Amino acid sequence: MERLSQMAGRRAWCAEDSVPRQEEEDRTRPSKTVTFKDVAVDLTQEEWQQMKPAQRALYRDVMLETYSNLVTVGCQVTKPDVIFKLEQAEEPWVLEEEMFWRRSPEAARGRMKSFAFKDMAKDLRFEDVVIYFSLEEWECLRHSHRNLYRAVMLDNYSNLLSLSLADTKPRVVSLLEQGKEPWMVMRNETKIWHPDWVSRTEAKDSSKIKTLQEKMAKKHTCPTLEDSKTRGDREVTRELEGQQVHQEGHLRQAAVTSVERPDSVQCTAHREAHPGGKPCSSEKSQKTSLCQPPPIEREQLHSKAKASEHAQHGKVFNSCTSDTAVHPRPQESRKDSERKKSALAGGPDTSKPQSAQGSERPHKCKECGKAFHTPSQLSHHQKLHVGEKPYKCQECGKAFPSNAQLSLHHRVHTDEKCFECKECGKAFMRPSHLLRHQRIHTGEKPHKCKECGKAFRYDTQLSLHLLTHAGARRFECKDCDKVYSCASQLALHQMSHTGEKPHKCKECGKGFISDSHLLRHQSVHTGETPYKCKECGKGFRRGSELARHQRAHSGDKPYKCKECGKSFTCTTELFRHQKVHTGDRPHKCKECGKAFIRRSELTHHERSHSGEKPYECKECGKTFGRGSELSRHQKIHTGEKPYKCQQCGKAFIRGSHLTQHQRIHTGRRSE
């Protein structure tokens, strides 16, 4: 992967810099020959065998494209052996003896220090080489990519510190050293990290562009300085650009430090980077910045990168990357760079992208009325209505409407869960899932209904609840007339009538309707009880069980039967009780015809016919037909008597025993 990161970094450098640099150098200084060896990456047999087919295809495409770029600008005359091999679809690792690039990490760091810092030690700062991520970008990175980013940033800061070029420690370095997520810095410094590229390139006065071109020419007059800057940028950004390799072999550019250049140079570099694509047109027509991939790739990456459109000129920018973040070059004075930053961040001609405006959502779905910031977001949403799912998982065959959803699904097969809960140890694939899970422990319910004041942990729960107020379409079961607010809930309910249980437990073979029910059941085998009562310390497998138990301490019974006035601690108990009044007993025994209110009661009854007693006491070997009976029996061995009479202090194993005992004090006879 390190070789692949080098290659991806060199691909971006060659595509962006080879042609414009040659044009500028022709006017200002004698050309310096760049050979294929200067930008090629050779692989050993071991490295080649470790690469996946998609990575090999990416390597082949990049090497051939790099060679094509060098031939175009006249920097390569003879065709290297590795190109012959790649064109004939042969493995290129046979050229192991010609390895010449980055023989060791120590040598690479030595070159970086000697070239990148030799002639610009006076002006180079950490801000010139740092790379920032937003929260959305940070969540797109895998765990290994985040470790790579952390190592590169700390290594850069260490190099600057050894050369006495760092005065104070930046906040992003402090966060990385503490093991915290560095995207938090974005909240306070957004304007500095994301200056508006449009206000600079679309200047009304053409003399500003001409002045910028003249400055570019002056910067290229010093070969040593420019060469050192180029090498320094490549060394710093090489590994990070390689981490965003698209799984179909496409390269998604990571957030990199951009070089200021006029539109004419930018368009030339864009044409060379993507041969065969549409050339950039004039100022009045639609233009696309360098941060965008080719048209085919861009369509595949819209789910990962939110595009924002410029209102006046139709320019499209990738808001998920930081390619537009402009850092001052070391040759410029601090005063000039600060002036440019302030002009780009809040100048009079600045036009903010629409996605940044937040409230404006001009693109509306005709099916459901939902609005979006960009046409690409609307396009992805419309796939849900038409049922289009072009992205298919090769492991299980499941299809998804966007590539981002497919990437997240792949973690199910790899079992990659990087975000762990400190309370119960449960791991999640996304930080947003972890934040939602932590609300179970904290009891936080931030989503409140304005109609009735009821609060919910998740926005999805609130959305379903709002349907009850709005009188929206309701889904009714034809077998028992039970009504649900969405079709998915009805589908799960209908499995209780058909007896279908597709999710099987590997430990005991028990089947369940949904995977969430299976996960709850598996805690029976592990003995895990993550939900603890703060009053008595008792543990529970589910948060709902804990909430129900806590009402026993408070005496709260908010659910009341309208028929007899009896109160209950939860809605399920109320629903079960109401069947006593209605006489509804939908679960019938096939052996004797006896009917039951609950399905669990039918299951326990069927064991009386079969004689099955699956619950065995480990102390005395006695077996029971129900788990609750086993739990009661085990209290005999432990001596636990949790039900205590407040009148005389006598304790009992069961609550029913306490109820019978209390009649002695009240003088009430049992019916």
UniProtKB/Swiss-Prot annotation:
Substitution effect: D61A: Decreases transcriptional repression
All residue ranges annotated as the KRAB domain in the record: 34-105, 124-195
Swiss-Prot/TrEMBL keywords: Developmental protein, DNA-binding, Metal-binding, Nucleus, Repeat, Transcription, Transcription regulation, Zinc, Zinc-finger
A single GO molecular function term of this UniProt record: zinc ion binding
Any one cellular-component term (Gene Ontology): nucleus
Zinc finger C2H2-type: from-to: 363-385, 391-413, 419-441, 447-469, 475-497, 503-525, 531-553, 559-581, 587-609, 615-637, 643-665
Intracellular or extracellular location(s): Nucleus
Tissue: Little or no expression detected in most adult tissues (brain, liver, kidney, spleen, testis, ovary). In the hippocampus, detected in neural stem cells within the subventricular zone and subgranular zone.
Gene Ontology process terms (BP): convergent extension involved in axis elongation; convergent extension involved in neural plate elongation; embryonic placenta morphogenesis; in utero embryonic development; negative regulation of DNA-templated transcription; negative regulation of transcription by RNA polymerase II; regulation of cell communication
UniProt-listed Gene3D superfamilies: 6.10.140.140, Classic Zinc Finger (3.30.160.60)
Null mutant phenotype: Mutant embryos arrest at 9 dpc, they fail to complete gastrulation, have convergent-extension failure and a yolk sac membrane-ruffling phenotype. Conditional knockdown in neural stem cells results in reduced brain weight at birth, however adult brain weights are normal and no other defects in brain development or morphology are apparent. Double knockout for ZNF568 and IGF2 embryos and fetuses are found at near Mendelian ratios and indistiguishable of wild type littermates at 12.5 dpc to 18.5 dpc. However, after birth few dead pups are recovered.
Compositionally skewed regions (Basic and acidic residues) per UniProt: 18-29, 226-251, 296-312, 329-341
Entry-linked Pfam families: KRAB, zf-C2H2
Domain characteristics, as noted in the entry: KRAB domain 1, but not KRAB domain 2, is required for transcriptional repression. Both contribute to interaction with TRIM28. Differences in repressive activity between KRAB domain 1 and 2 are likely due to amino acid differences at multiple residues.
Function field: Has transcriptional repression activity, partially through the recruitment of the corepressor TRIM28 but also has repression activity independently of this interaction. Essential during embryonic development, where it acts as direct repressor of IGF2-P0, placental-specific transcript of IGF2, in early development and regulates convergent extension movements required for axis elongation and tissue morphogenesis in all germ layers. Also important for normal morphogenesis of extraembryonic tissues including the yolk sac, extraembryonic mesoderm and placenta.
Family: Belongs to the krueppel C2H2-type zinc-finger protein family.
Complex formation: Interacts with TRIM28.
Record's protein name: Zinc finger protein 568
Organism of derivation: Mus musculus (Mouse)
